[in-house]
């Protein structure tokens, strides 16, 4: 629920004039995530696809792995000033897990909140940063043609509708190795955009995401590589640079990591055998 954009009048200064004009802004709002009624974390996100975001987040945290691990996802009513009815503000979500699914340990998951720029920054311990995947993308035999990869960034840009209006959102997209775009999501946080597309697959019982490519609009960080690993994605591509830890994790887990995917060129850092 909620709106991805807001409007505000701004004063625009250029070399020859000063004018007041309307401007479209990307919305950033907090989302409190609860599991079985217990608060787990607060993330700063762009409203929209919240159910996908939360389920993708829980998958990346190793809490759930398959659709049947989640019973329900629902917005919570919350009393706020001017809203004495307790009606939902669409900024608090509760996930009810299936019997036997262990909820996250809130003592090590997040200390306070997750910023829109970094999802692991709020981790309470170094041990809580790394998760063990139930899937093994290193054994995925899928291959993808270099020309198919080169065409993906343009497809992603064309699908970034809110970015085109605001210039303020990251994007993530899932592709089949044949180049077909499966899903694209935008968010002010790059990790949220990835959680949303992974949550899209989770809701459709498509985890693990074998024979797929995850494309991100910015850099390839450790955290995004870990999310790809947790979802069983064999190929991670980024239009910008990778970090050293992202390359190390991709190498250790058998993920093909492609970065600087721009125009007619790319760098392949790990498992280059998948690129044909």
Curated annotation (Swiss-Prot):
Q: Which family does it belong to?
A: Belongs to the FdhD family.
Pfam families named in the record: FdhD-NarQ (PF02634)
Q: What does this protein do?
A: Required for formate dehydrogenase (FDH) activity. Acts as a sulfur carrier protein that transfers sulfur from IscS to the molybdenum cofactor prior to its insertion into FDH.
Give the record's GO biological process terms. Mo-molybdopterin cofactor biosynthetic process
Q: Which UniProt keywords apply?
A: Cytoplasm, Molybdenum cofactor biosynthesis
Identify one Gene Ontology CC term for this UniProt entry.
cytoplasm
**This protein is called what?**
Sulfur carrier protein FdhD
Tree of life domain = Bacteria
Q: Coiled-coil intervals in this record? A: none
GO molecular function per UniProt? sulfur carrier activity; sulfurtransferase activity
Q: Which SUPFAM superfamilies is this protein grouped with? A: Cytidine deaminase-like (SSF53927)
Query: Where does the record place it?
Result: Cytoplasm
Record carries keyword Transmembrane? no
Q: Which InterPro entries match?
A: Cytidine_deaminase-like, FdhD
Query: What is the source species?
Result: Mycobacterium bovis (strain ATCC BAA-935 / AF2122/97)
Active site at 118 (cysteine persulfide intermediate)
